[in-house]
Amino acid sequence: MTNHVVLYEPLMPANTGNIARTCAGTNTILDLIEPLGFQIDNKKMKRAGLDYWDKVDIRMHDDLDAFLKTLGPNDEMYLISKFSSKNYAQVDYTDPNKDYYFVFGKETTGLPETFMREYYDRNLRIPMSDNIRCYNLSNSVAMVLLEALRQQGFPNMETSHHYENDKLKDNYNRPERYERNLGEN
């Protein structure tokens, strides 16, 4: 069982970089469907992904049709859209014989309407109030992906953290780091 986050023609490099970091932290494959709204080596995207780029399995697809041709018979594809009435948390993502693909549309216009109609039974919604048009793409990815991983028992992920084994602890255990930020009140 493998999870995939699929971004259809993403426009904002910082969102894509943040999503790549989430994919690195969850052992999730990131599929990018072109055209992208930025260059893959964009500085903002690189910064948002920090130094985790070597930990991300990124797969590029020329267009939506090219991506669809990569799906196998046991793959489950879900389209995340505000136009669905089915809640993403009401789906079972635990079949070990399936790979799960979570497809997210571009930040401004979402997924193509014809694509959503063709796969209408695969559309899922993240609940939200009518106070906003939509959630941030990166936040939406994290919500859906972590629900799938929760159901799957967080495979190959730390579910607790022990500070004494933290490879970064020396960088965060320096009092001067905090004193510098406190200032005088």
From Swiss-Prot:
Keywords, ordered alphabetically: Cytoplasm, Methyltransferase, S-adenosyl-L-methionine, Transferase, tRNA processing
Q: Where in the cell is it found?
A: Cytoplasm
The record's annotation in InterPro entries points to: Alpha/beta_knot_MTases, SpoU_MeTrfase, TrmL, tRNA_m1G_MTases_N
- So what does this thing catalyse? cytidine(34) in tRNA + S-adenosyl-L-methionine = 2'-O-methylcytidine(34) in tRNA + S-adenosyl-L-homocysteine + H(+); 5-carboxymethylaminomethyluridine(34) in tRNA(Leu) + S-adenosyl-L-methionine = 5-carboxymethylaminomethyl-2'-O-methyluridine(34) in tRNA(Leu) + S-adenosyl-L-homocysteine + H(+)
Give me the Gene Ontology terms describing cellular component. cytoplasm
Q: What does this protein do?
A: Could methylate the ribose at the nucleotide 34 wobble position in tRNA.
What family classification does the UniProt entry report for this protein?
Belongs to the class IV-like SAM-binding methyltransferase superfamily. RNA methyltransferase TrmH family. TrmL subfamily.
* Protein name according to UniProt: Putative RNA (cytidine(34)-2'-O)-methyltransferase
Give the taxonomic lineage as stored in the record: Bacteria, Bacillati, Bacillota, Bacilli, Lactobacillales
In terms of HAMAP family, this protein maps to:
tRNA_methyltr_TrmL
Annotated S-adenosyl-L-methionine binding lies at: 80, 105, 126
